[in-house]
């Protein structure tokens, strides 16, 4: 009798994706982040579902409903903080995953890469709208500032902003629709992730060497299921350390003050995982220019395959590109730090230099370094 896992219409899909999947034998821990992102997404959907049972999306009661969840609901505090800090873990895994893709040349799988970029934008939109829901000071002003950026679009900008707001300012209509979108988008992310995986399994995984591993494949289970479980345990350990010991470490104290349209906080800033993009936005004095730079800071990933001038796929044997990659990482950390600082000297200048360097590394230095490395191969 044939094994049910290979014949049953549903189970054979799971089998070909997670059990008998031929996988390169040499993929490192950097390949763990895909499964960790899946775990983060499921965790966020589950905790979010339980929060939505007690949350009210009304400007008068939103803040107090979050307080009610933390004080009165059984284990409400842990659900709320797992959701808030789960978002941070989600973005840590996301940036590691994208960084891995850049380092090892995984962007040559065009469909998988482009779906990944769409996923990144969708997750960022979801996180932004989620940050608005507690209706604290930073929620309100963050929503006001970021949605207002759309007014920089010529001709239709102002109408577009008012259409998104559902009025002439961020108010009840805005909060209600943000809650609706924040609830539905994770399921869109789930569907996109399935498509992402579908395209990945068409080609098979990349590996650290960047050369074809068709001659050396091993089954996903038990080798990588065990490895993924270890990664998951470490992820949950870090998340629970955050949740149980310093749940507000990554949050903003201003968000413990209820939203007040008449009082602007001294420093409006988004969550830490958006600070690098926020710093790029602020470093350009022109409003439309800033918005374009903000979008391009992520969209630039889409042209990574076009800028690939190297004869080798990954950076494993390319020391110049490696140095530039880690310079890019340092630059992003600098931008993250700058995004959280007030707009004053010397932070403005540092932010502008870091922003220029970010685009220069990706658009100019890396392609040139690849050409130099190609020539070194001939020596």
From Swiss-Prot:
Q: Which PANTHER family match?
A: CYTOCHROME B
Family, according to the entry, reads as follows: Belongs to the cytochrome b family.
Give the lineage: Eukaryota, Metazoa, Chordata, Craniata, Vertebrata
Arranged from A to Z, the UniProt key words for this protein are: Electron transport, Heme, Iron, Membrane, Metal-binding, Mitochondrion, Mitochondrion inner membrane, Respiratory chain, Transmembrane, Transmembrane helix, Transport, Ubiquinone
User: What's the source species for this entry?
Assistant: Erignathus barbatus (Bearded seal)
Query: Which one of the record's GO molecular function terms can you name?
Result: ubiquinol-cytochrome-c reductase activity
Protein's name according to its UniProt entry: Cytochrome b
| Subcellular localization | Mitochondrion inner membrane
Question: Among the entry's GO cellular component annotations, what is one?
Answer: respiratory chain complex III
